[in-house]
Structures are given as C-alpha cells and as structure tokens.
From Swiss-Prot:
The chain crosses the membrane at residues 394-412, 415-431, 446-475, 550-569, 588-608, 652-671, 740-764, 786-824. V-ATPase is a heteromultimeric enzyme made up of two complexes: the ATP-hydrolytic V1 complex and the proton translocation V0 complex. The V1 complex consists of three catalytic AB heterodimers that form a heterohexamer, three peripheral stalks each consisting of EG heterodimers, one central rotor including subunits D and F, and the regulatory subunits C and H. The proton translocation complex V0 consists of the proton transport subunit a, a ring of proteolipid subunits c9c'', rotary subunit d, subunits e and f, and the accessory subunits ATP6AP1/Ac45 and ATP6AP2/PRR. The gene is Atp6v0a2. This is V-type proton ATPase 116 kDa subunit a 2. It is found in: Cell membrane; Endosome membrane. Keywords: Cell membrane, Endosome, Hydrogen ion transport, Ion transport, Membrane, Phosphoprotein, Transmembrane, Transmembrane helix, Transport. It comes from Mus musculus. GO terms for molecular function: proton-transporting ATPase activity, rotational mechanism. It is a multi-pass membrane protein.
C-alpha cells in the first residue's frame, strides 16, 4: 500500500496500440486497474465514434442476458456463482458467443410461447368443463328466480320458458353460456336487463373452486352464467355485452347427447394437454438450467467487453489509421506494471509489432490517488466527503484515524456506552466476510462500511469514560478514593488543631444539609486518584461545577493543539511544493498569532494548575481576568500569576500585532518583487516550457533524459505562477481574505471547540436523568416483587440507552466531530480541490445490470 500521508506521484503516459492488439491490451489493463484514460475525442459525439457498432452489439448481448436472467429467476432456478471474474472474451470468440446467445433466446422465446399457448388452452378447456357441469341442470330445474335488484320485475314461477311454448309463439330461442368474474356479476346482470329490456333470462351459479384467468394468470373466483333470449337482435346485444365485461363465452350444447360427446372430448384433450405441457415445462427447465450454468460468467464478460470498447472510443487514431493513441494517468510506481500489461496484450494477440508507451510532460494537474485498505477506507471517505485532496498535498486521513474517534470520545465519554459500541463494532469486524452483511440494506450497509470507525470510537469512548469515571452515569471506585471523610471529625484531632480548623461534630452532622471536605485539613486529602476523576465527586453537590471547569479547559487545550497541528502540516505542503516563502510569510505569522494569544492561554491554565495548591487556591487570580488584562494594559498593578507577567504579555501582544501585517502584505509584496526581478530564488532555472508531443515521431525524438526531467518537474510546473498570469490585485485580495479569515477564525474556531464540553455535559446529564427515572426506581423496590419489576425496567432502560444515548447522541457527537475536522482543522492546510483517480478496472464493474452502463 502506498503512503497515506501524501497522494501517489502520477505521470501522464501516451500509449501506442496497434489496431489488432488494442482490445487485448486494454483487457490486460482492465484486469490490473493501473491507469485512468483521458478522453481524446471530447468534441466527437458518442454516436460518431469508431467503436459505436461494437458498443451496440454489447448492449444487444446485455439485453439477451437480461431476458435469460429474468426467465431463470421466474423458473426458481438458482444462479450459480461460477468464476468470480472471468477474463474478457477473445475477439475470435465474440461472434460465436453472440450466435449462441441469439439462438438460445429464439429457442427460449419459442418454447415459452408454446408453453403459454398450451397453458391458455388448458385453462379454457377446464373452464369449459366446469361450465358444462354447472349448466347441466339449468334447463331441468324449475325453481323460482328471485331478482337481486328492486328495479327488476318479478319473473314467472318457471325460470325458463318451456321450449314448446316458445315454438307456439313463433320466436327463436337462443342460449349464451360462459364464465364471468365475481366482481362483475351485479353490473353485468343490470346491463343485460336495461339493454335487452327484459327479453333475456339470466341464470348463474358460483363455482366451488377458484380458477386462474388465462389472460392475466390471476387466481380469482368465477361465476357460471346461462342467458336465454329470443330474437337474433337480442342475441347480438347479449354477445356484445359479454365482450364488454370480458366474459369467457363457450358453446352451449342443444341436446344431452351433444353435451355428453363434448364432455368426453374435453376430458381426452385435457389429459393430452397435461402430458404435452409437462413435457414442455421439463424441456424448458432443462434449457434454463443449462443457460444458468454460464449466464453469470457471460454477464461479467459482456460488461468487460463493453467497458473495453468505451475506453477505445476515448482513443484517437494516427494519420495511417493503423495505430490507436491513448493518454492515461498512471502512478509512477505502476509504470513497470503498465509496460508488462502492454507486452502481455501484444503477446496474446500474436502481433508482430508490440504496443508501447512513453511518458510525456504536462502542466495539467494530475488526479489524486491515495491507496487505502479496509481499515483506512472509512476515514478516507470522511475526508473525501469534504473534498478530494489536491495533487500531492498532505492527506488529513492519516491523522483523522486517531483524532476523529478521540474527539468523538471526548463528547461521548462513557465507559458503559463506549463498551457497548465497541462490542457492536467488534461483531461487525469479526463477521465482515459474511455475504449477508456486505449485501444488506442501506442503513445496515452504512454501519458495516464504517465498522472500523465505530470500533475506534467505542474504544476511545471507553478510555475517556475511564478518565471521566462515568459508567452509565455512575462512578466506579476501582482504586479507592483519595479523600478521607473520617479525618473531618473533631475527635480525630487535638484540641489545638480543632481551634484552627473547621471540623465536624455530631451537631454539624445532624443540622447541616451539606458537608464540605477541606483538603487543607491533614488526612482529608491523601493524593490524587490514580487514573481519572475521583469517584467521590459523584456524591458532591458541586460536581457539575467542577466537571464544567475541567471539561471547558480541556476543550480549549485540545482545540488549540488541534488547530496548531493543522498549521504545522501546512508547512509540509509549502516545502513539498517548493514555496519556502510561504513558510516565512504565511505559516510563521500564523503560528505566532496562534501561540502568542491562545498558546499563552494554555500556558496560564497549566501554570495555574501546577503553581497553586489547595492551601493557596484562594490567592490564585482569575485566568479570564488576566487574559482580558493582557490586551487592556491596565495601569493599576494586579497580583499576576508569576513575576514579570506584564512584560511577557506586552511582548506577546507586540508579536501578535506584528504578525498580522506580515500575514496580510508579506506574500503579495514578495511575489510582486519576484515578478519584477525574475532572477531571484532560481527563477531562471525553472523558466523552461513543458510541451506535449502530439505524435509518435515527436515522442521518439525526445531523449530519455528530457523525459525524466519532465516527470520530475511536473509537480512544480502544475503549480508555477507564470509571469503572464501574475495579477497583483488578485493576489492581494486573496491574501487579505485569507488573513482576515484566519485571524477571526482562530477566535471563532477556538470557541467552536467548546462543543466538546457542551456535548459531553449533555450526554452525561441525559444519562444521569435516564438512570434516575428508571433504574433508581427499579432498584429501590425492596418487596418480593422487586425482581419481577426490575426485569421490565432493565429492558426499557436498555432500549432507551441504545436508541437515545447510543444512536441519537452518538450520531450527534459523530456529526460534531466531522465538523471540527472539516472546518476547524482542515481549513488550516487542506485545499481539497483535486479530482479523484478513477482507474479503468474491471473490479469496479458489477455483475448486475443497471440503467447506467458507463464505467465509473
């Protein structure tokens, strides 16, 4: 893995690919994932590029594979994983693969079409059989037909008129029979009555079982109906109404003999159709099983082939159209691998003239490549979310690995909560190879991707929880308190000592609401707690006052150290980019401004802690007053922290005042002087011009020494401000904005770090309230039923702890930690104006199809 401190050194390379070997060379490059292609045909439409026909062929193959996957999934056939990453298919096998897939598609569509046709015929025959069975007794029955709706007039006692009677009336009696869905029966009957004006008689009955609709495949409830009518015009109306309501009409036999013959024929045909349908389904499943063996590999191969042609469309042809020219960004350490990939592709294609590459100088800014692993990837993503780092500048992710979980833990510090978070993250880490976790839903996937961040956040929270001595809002007495309560009783001291000190007696114990421990009394304070805060503070009424003072000062100290470290990292950027004047004219004034004010504030805090004990604490001056007096220069003499304090503060204020104009005007004036002189600091040595060679002939004229020199100076050329681009007004305005932003930002950013204190206080108080409202109530029950009450109380306490204190409070602390890194820390040195290096790599392809077919 490359360095995480700074991005990889990149170079621009020109590839010369023979037409017959270009496909194989790009296939080898895609497997290695070493280079990022530049589009040399930006002014050419995607429909006018050289290999658009091949891309269309790949899209057609993708369409066929999508159809195959859909049919295999519909048949509930498992898709075997097969080879994880098969190579791109050779060109000589592409046409064969296309013919096989097209032939398989035609066969599947034909078999599927025949199967659906057989299935539809079978369902129609089954419906016809049910219709004959139900309507068999309609003409033999003589029951009273009761209308469903009041607007229907009552019928005669006989539901159907006698056929002989109709013959005597001279009318022609007709029948229409079929099936209709249950939900359409009432509307269907109403429409028949209104349209036919009562010249129809409808008889219907519900089927005992649900049948599948041949059109939709939905299993629904059906009704069998028989419509008797007289007159040809009425018959036409009835048939049209049946079509409107999507009724399934079947011929109605006129005689019992005809009914019996139809029934026998239907039974025979149904048995034959069952046999043919089963054989068709077996054959279709065999074809799909055979296709499923290679469909996953085919998907990957087609995606790789399409990606290769996308990259070939970015290349340009030379004047002879026999050679493709490509420009790629490649890390310098991967140049040998790039050459080997070209040799491998040329060897596989059997070309007599191998493909080759040359590095070319450029003034363009290369993309940023920072190699990560599964541990550092999450922290790098946090930095990249703010902005991808500029080329070769210091990468904050290296330090974020420690500072981010630590600042989170300062706000979240609780031993119990941190340990629960650590266990959850440890569970994700130990099961990181589980396929269900890596393919889970979005929220769980987000936790899984940040498992190492959660692990360190939980681990650091355990550490800060031990310092705060907080475990679910309660203190843990591991080493014994450093305070001795018994030493405060008067009985433990001599009468002479009792006259000099305020001690406790029985009356004091009975009548005082609060008792104060005096560390000046011998034996009361035996020394500091070995690690963290003494557990006796958990019982003190002034506990919150003490913790607020401690956490506020700690937040200021951590914030100033964090920001100063960011300014120091900026020095590494200036030295790397050969801009030493920025060190003296920008970084040094910034450090002086920061340390002379806020560094001195840290000094006063630590000095007061060390110089004043419990005996002299009443004489200790206020740091706030002393810090304000530092800028007011009071005439009256005050008792300072140390001798000579006023002189030291005057010197620090003078340095601060002098640093501001240097920061404001130093860099613009120096660049103006440099622009007018042109002979200072080696400008004559750097005044060369980097020219890109646009053809193979020009590249061949370059000597190896020139190419090496161009590569080594590419970084300087990318950032060099030429004489033609110099604009003093713009530089002055930019530096003025930077100076004002920095000076005001030092104050606002220092105040912003007080969120460490605020969120730590909020988390501790919320945890304390949750304990007091739930666990304290459950633990105070002394009856026999106390255990039974404690179980639901503990369960409710655990649920609220997880969702409120771990999830909600953890998310809040997480966002505030991100803010402190993005704004307060990274703006001191991090530009974040680069572009990410996205290599042409087959590992970035997915085996699943999506609407976006381009290579990410």
């Amino acid at each position: 893995m490359g360095s995480l401190f700074r991005s990889e050194s990149m170079c621009l390379a020109q590839l010369f690919l023979q037409s017959g070997t270009a496909y194989e060379c790009l296939s080898a490059l895609g497997e290695k994932g070493l280079v990022q292609f530049r589009d040399l045909n930006q002014n050419v439409s995607s429909f006018q590029r050289k290999f658009v026909g091949e891309v269309k062929r790949c899209e057609e193959l993708e369409r066929i594979l999508v159809y195959l996957v859909q049919e295999i999934t519909r048949a509930d056939i498992p898709l075997p994983e097969g080879e994880a990453s098969p190579p791109a298919p050779p060109l000589k096998h592409v046409l064969e693969m296309q013919e096989q897939l097209q032939k398989l598609e035609v066969e599947l569509r034909e078999v599927t079409k025949n199967k659906e046709k057989l299935r539809k015929n079978l369902l129609e025959l089954v419906e016809y059989t049910h219709m004959l069975r139900v309507t068999k007794t309609f003409l033999k029955r003589n029951v009273e037909f009761e209308p469903t709706y009041e607007e229907f007039p009552a019928l005669e006692n006989d539901s159907l008129l006698d056929y002989s009677c109709m013959q005597r009336l001279g009318a022609k009696l007709g029948f229409v029979s079929g099936l209709i869905q249950q939900g359409r029966v009432e509307a269907f009957e109403r429409m028949l009555w209104r349209a036919c004006k009562g010249y129809t008689i409808v008889t219907y009955a519900e089927l005992d079982e649900c049948l599948e609709d041949p059109e939709t495949g939905e299993v629904i409830k059906w009704y069998v109906f028989l419509i008797s009518f007289w007159g040809e015009q009425i018959g036409h109306k009835v048939k049209k109404i049946c079509d409107c309501y999507h009724c399934h009409i079947y011929p109605y036999p006129n005689t019992a003999e005809e009914r019996r013959e139809i029934q026998e024929g239907l039974n025979t045909r149904i048995q034959d159709l069952y046999t043919v349908l089963h054989k068709t389904e077996d054959y279709l499943r065999q074809v799909l099983c055979k296709a499923a063996e290679s469909v996953c590999s085919r998907v990957v191969q087609v995606r790789k082939m399409k990606a290769i042609y996308h990259m070939l469309n970015m290349c340009s042809f030379d004047v002879t159209n026999k050679c493709l020219i490509a420009e790629v960004w490649c890390p310098e350490v991967d140049l040998p691998g790039l050459r080997r990939a070209l040799e491998e592709g040329s060897r596989e294609s059997g070309a007599t003239i191998p493909s080759f590459m040359n590095t070319i100088p450029t003034k363009e800014t290369p993309p940023t490549l920072i190699r990560t692993n599964k541990f550092t990837e999450g922290f790098q993503n946090i930095v990249d979310a703010y902005g991808v780092g500029s080329y070769r500048e210091v990468n904050p992710a290296l330090f974020t690995i420690i500072t981010f979980p630590f600042l989170f833990a300062v706000m979240f510090g609780d031993f119990g909560h941190g340990f629960v978070m650590f266990l959850f993250a440890l569970l994700l880490v130990l099961n990181e190879n589980h396929p269900r976790l890596s393919q889970s839903q979005e929220i769980l996937r987000m936790f899984f991707d940040g498992r190492y961040i959660l692990l360190l956040m939980g681990l650091f929270s355990v550490y800060t929880g031990l310092i705060y001595n907080d475990c679910f809002s309660k203190s843990v007495n591991l080493f014994g308190s450093g305070w001795n309560v018994s030493a405060m009783y008067s009985s433990s001291h001599s009468p002479e000592e009792q006259r000099k000190m305020v001690l406790w007696n029985d009356s004091t114990i009975r009548h005082s609401r609060t008792l104060q421990l005096d560390p000046n009394i011998p034996g009361v304070f035996r020394g500091p707690y070995p690690f963290g805060i003494d557990p006796i503070w958990n019982l003190a009424t002034n506990r919150l006052t003490f913790l607020n003072s401690f956490k506020m000062k700690m937040s200021v100290i951590l914030g100033i150290f964090h920001m100063t470290f960011g300014v120091v990292l900026g020095i590494f950027n200036h030295l790397h980019f050969r801009k030493k004047f920025n060190v003296y004219l920008v970084s040094v004034p910034e450090i002086l401004f920061m340390l002379c004010i806020f560094g001195y504030l840290i000094f006063m805090i630590i000095y007061k802690w060390l110089a004043y004990s419990a005996e002299t604490s009443r004489e200790a001056p206020s740091i706030l007053i002393e810090f304000i007096n530092m800028f007011l220069f009071p005439t009256s003499k005050t008792h300072g922290l140390y001798p000579g304090q006023a002189h030291v503060q005057r010197v620090l204020v003078a340095l601060t005042v002098l640093a501001v104009p240097v920061l404001f005007l130093g860099k613009p004036l120096f660049l103006l002087w440099l622009h007018n002189g042109r002979n200072c600091f080696g400008m004559s040595r750097s005044g060369y011009t980097l020219v890109r060679k646009d053809s193979e002939e020009e590249v061949s004229l370059l000597g190896n020494q020139d190419i090496e020199e161009g590569n080594s100076r590419m970084e300087e050329g990318c950032r060099e401000v030429t004489c033609e681009e110099f604009n003093f007004g713009e530089i002055l305005m930019t530096q003025a904005i930077h100076s004002i932003e920095y000076c005001l930002g030092c104050i606002s950013n220092t105040a912003s770090y007080l969120r460490l204190w605020a969120l730590s206080l909020a988390h501790a108080q919320l945890s304390d309230v949750l304990w007091a409202m739930l666990m304290r109530v459950g633990l105070r029950v002394d009856t026999t039923y106390g255990v039974l009450l404690l179980l639901p109380v503990m369960a409710f306490f655990a649920v609220l702890t997880i969702f409120i204190l771990l999830v909600m409070e953890g998310l809040s602390a997480f966002l505030h930690a991100i803010r402190l890194h993005w704004v307060e820390f990274q703006n001191k040195f991090y530009v974040g104006a680069g572009t990410k290096f996205v290599p042409f790599s087959f590992s970035l392809l997915s085996s699943k199809f999506s609407n976006d077919d381009s290579i990410a």
